[in-house]
């Protein structure tokens, strides 16, 4: 796919950090924070400084390998948190990256009962509401920086359950002529439950 846009998938949730960021990592330099921690502490200057430093290092690492970055997004939507989104947009502008992902998903339902009889689905509805709220705030930041974004996203409500039906019904709920991102994690296992990213969020 020679024309496929490649994102910098910014990560401060798992794995090893590229920088010294003790507010994000354990003593071994591995990320060990949760989404709630980031929301509650998003106004703390020192934390934001370390996040910017780590995001910058990750962008630079990609650029060192001669990869042109088309857009920015993040692991488990950490950049959606409004104060972190501001950092992301600042870096996008600095590195001439024109697109930053936003996470507004229209609520939709697949007419299959088993899709909803699990512990993940109610939590996914909470995620949708939170990310919708963040996106409404973040669109103002996008405009301030003159950046572009997708109009909608599909895949949050059915995280861990994505299939052709989830995509089909998700697209039906969205206005035509919209830019849409579908969140799909390639599977490693025949047992789809082993590929679930629900716990990460």
Residue ranges of predicted features:
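Terminal accessory/targeting
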Residues: 1-71, 82-201
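Active-site histidine-anchored catalytic micro-motif
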Residues: 74-76
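Acidic, metal-coordinating catalytic cores used for nucleic-acid/nucleotide bond scission
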Residues: 78-80
């Amino acid at each position: 796919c020679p024309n496929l846009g490649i994102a910098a998938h910014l990560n401060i949730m798992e794995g090893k950090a590229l920088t010294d960021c003790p507010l994000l990592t354990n003593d071994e330099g591995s990320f060990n924070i949760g989404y709630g921690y980031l929301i509650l502490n998003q106004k703390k200057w020192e934390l934001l400084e370390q996040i910017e430093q780590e995001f910058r290092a990750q962008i630079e690492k990609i650029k060192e390998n001669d990869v042109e970055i088309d857009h920015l997004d993040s692991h488990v939507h950490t950049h959606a948190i409004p104060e972190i989104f501001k950092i992301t947009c600042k870096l996008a502008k600095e590195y001439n990256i024109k697109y930053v992902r936003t996470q507004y998903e229209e609520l939709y339902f697949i007419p299959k009962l088993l899709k909803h009889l699990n512990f993940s689905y109610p939590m996914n509805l909470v995620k949708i509401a939170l990310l919708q709220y963040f996106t409404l705030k973040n669109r103002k930041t996008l405009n301030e920086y003159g950046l572009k974004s997708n109009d909608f996203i599909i895949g949050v409500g059915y995280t861990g359950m994505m299939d052709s039906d989830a995509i089909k019904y998700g697209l039906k709920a969205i206005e035509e002529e919209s830019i849409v991102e579908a969140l799909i994690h390639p599977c490693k296992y025949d047992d789809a439950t082993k590929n679930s990213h629900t716990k990460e969020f």
